[in-house]
Amino acid sequence: LANILNTLDVEEHFGYMQSTRDFHFNAYDIFSSLVFARAVSPLSKHKTFHDILPSLFKPVDFSYDQLLDAVEFIGSEYEKFVEIFTVATRENFGIETKHTYFDCTNFYFEIDKENRFQRKGPSKEGRHDPIVGLGLLLDSNMIPIGMKMYPGNESEKPVLRKTIQDLKKQNNIDGRTIQIADKGLNCARNILEAIDHCDGYIFSKSVKQLSETERTWVLLENDYTPVYDGSGEID
């Protein structure tokens, strides 16, 4: 990971970005330390700072409060940082956009009150915590090349359509985008939108909720190809 970050050579961009803040720490050093710690053991920022960072090869020369300030700074400018890393990845490793993939997910926050961004919205788990939605665009090799966050109370269906087009335009992508979605985004409008833009889609749907005709078709044994694991068992 350290070699990849060094090859991307984005530290100077972090310096430019943090020049507008009166920080007494290096935001890039904190960012890179968090990346390494996340790969070792994905924990909360508190546990990461106290349990993981001291064991890494880089000395910790910043406080926990400074870490939180850096996280707030990077989060507030996340779209610019994503663009910086996307450009650096394209220049140093290449990005394959003949086919791209797009998916949405949610993040929960254990806070008592909502704010303008962390809002209560639909939850498959039935939770009532405020959430933030995330749309992620991946290249053909599953490398993230674009992302968009939005308030958790917004419907993902229109967000899906707008975010895909915005991210494709921003990254100059004219290839085919495959939309990956569960039943929450599985609607006729999204399917038509994908077809109209010559894109594709993989939408899941509950077999129990299918019509009798569709359920019969899904359960047919023909046209399925067995996939075996290393022991010769069907995977």
Feature-to-residue mapping (PLM):
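Short, surface-exposed basic-aromatic patches at helix termini and helix-loop junctions that form
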Residues: 172, 191-200
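Active-site beta-loop-alpha junctions of metal-dependent nucleic acid enzymes
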Residues: 148-170
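An anionic, glycine-rich sequence signature occurring as long contiguous blocks
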Residues: 130-132, 146-149, 197-235
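Acidic, metal-coordinating catalytic cores used for nucleic-acid/nucleotide bond scission
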Residues: 155, 180-189, 207-209
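A short acidic (Asp/Glu
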Residues: 111-113, 187-193, 212-215
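Dynamic "connector" segments at or just before major functional cores
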Residues: 1-116, 128, 135-153
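Short, surface-exposed connector motifs at secondary-structure boundaries
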Residues: 143, 170-177
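A conserved hydrophobic secondary-structure block that centers on an alpha-helix together
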Residues: 42-46, 167-170, 180-181
